[in-house]
């Protein structure tokens, strides 16, 4: 069936196109002769740029249109940044492949200052993420944190125009766009716990499409998949979308998983942290157990405020 064309649904931002091209190249390398095409599309999250993401509401702002294309047969797979993938999928679709994780860290970017510690009181820092915002506000309550939307290039332009003294972006995105030189300080997980799945690329497809699933199998990276599975299980129990003040990061060494997570009040006034260690085979159970602990320790109330009064059960 190599005469059939595999179609990839993708957003049109430079970073999304990089990710789709990366998957295309990996597929062509694994299956010589396979024809792969990109199907660029615009999502709701790409259109609504004048409102902070947390206020736009809804889960899957960056993926729904791609999923519709797969359900209607206009595309075979969709390539996502894992941190944008909702915890639930439409019937018939699922996440079947997670590629090897790139740098999971956040990055401090500034033209004038080399680190967060160097920022004077009152400095304006841009981020669209409640997760980054709550952690930054907790350590530096003297900073002015402002919403920052748009693709990576747009955000850097706003920094360069002087609208912000510094901005926080995902290190992986900057590296993929060959903008690593803009990173002044990579932020360790201790400084800024990453988003669920940050740095990993995931591939979604129709679950009954055996041909496509077979083509995707060689791209799956088992260690990354285990780590992201633990992070996503924790996030699912917290009913987290891609715009919630939730951080989670799993590391795997010699078969043992170390999972850290936090839920924070957006203003940084409260951060609830926890961690779990256990065998990789129990990735989901560790994630759920950690989520329960966070909920019992105050995360339920924080999330109820973020979700307009609806706390995770």
Swiss-Prot record:
Keywords attached to this entry: Porphyrin biosynthesis, Transferase
Extra remark beyond the main annotation: The porphobilinogen subunits are added to the dipyrromethane group.
Cofactor: dipyrromethane
Cofactor note (record): Binds 1 dipyrromethane group covalently.
List of residues that carry S-(dipyrrolylmethanemethyl)cysteine: 242
GO molecular function: hydroxymethylbilane synthase activity
Pfam families listed in its UniProt record: Porphobil_deam (PF01379), Porphobil_deamC (PF03900)
Quaternary structure (record): Monomer.
Example GO biological process: protoporphyrinogen IX biosynthetic process
One cellular component (GO) term of this entry: cytoplasm
Principal EC category: transferase
Record-stated family: Belongs to the HMBS family.
SUPFAM superfamilies: Periplasmic binding protein-like II (SSF53850), Porphobilinogen deaminase (hydroxymethylbilane synthase), C-terminal domain (SSF54782)
Name listed for the protein in its UniProt record: Porphobilinogen deaminase
Cysteines paired by S-S bonds: none
Function: Tetrapolymerization of the monopyrrole PBG into the hydroxymethylbilane pre-uroporphyrinogen in several discrete steps.
Involved pathway(s): Porphyrin-containing compound metabolism; protoporphyrin-IX biosynthesis; coproporphyrinogen-III from 5-aminolevulinate: step 2/4
Swiss-Prot/TrEMBL catalytic activity: 4 porphobilinogen + H2O = hydroxymethylbilane + 4 NH4(+)
